[in-house]
Amino acid sequence: MIEFKNIEKYYGDFHALKNINLTFNQGEVVVVIGPSGSGKSTMLRCINGLEDITEGELLIKGTNLHAKGTNINEIRKNVGMVFQHFNLYPHKTVLENIMLAPMKVLKQSKEEAQKNAEKFLEKVNMLDKKDAYPSNLSGGQQQRVAIARGLAMGPGVLLFDEPTSALDPETIEDVLDVMKKLAKEGMTMIVVTHEMGFAREVADRVIFMADGEVLEDRETVSFFENPKDERAKQFLSKIINH
């Protein structure tokens, strides 16, 4: 479904992504881990065109994202993203936040958009807050609304960029529960996270990145039980022993 072919990414002289070759398949849950500054979020943001690549090819459902003539907005309809800091519109209600993109981009009627928004709010256990404003919600509640907003576009894949790192500990579990539910339903998900318990329980594969490189791309159990790369071993021992 998504292919990285010899991807390089520079910010000026800084080499952010180095020769990335990855394939993400339909229905997979892939967790991407690694130390800060390793290129995880950059790699994720390349998938929906928030970041350009410097060299290589990025294919989504066989379409080269950066080829001349590619309509990037059409591609983006198939790629949902959930950010670390929710990015909800503060002056709009929960329901309005979710209805906005389907009405503007997918040209849904107000009635259809509302019906779908309520369906996805129910899925993330937030239907009772549909008329609330983001400022009246906890971080965890806002993140669940952001997930519903991503789902409302009917994407083929959902990208999660550290979705729990800005949350209070007591609200993290609610967000992870929603993500686990989506995984069980067969949603294709690529998740940048430090939540190792979630990775162990839900991921089909784990990708470990450091200094802009993919150092491990392995089936979850074998990665956690027997990481081969020395930096992956050090990273796991630090994060699991804390």
PLM features: residue spans?
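ABC family nucleotide-binding domain
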Residues: 1-220
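C-terminal boundary and immediately downstream tail of ABC-type ATPase nucleotide-binding domains
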Residues: 210, 217, 221-242
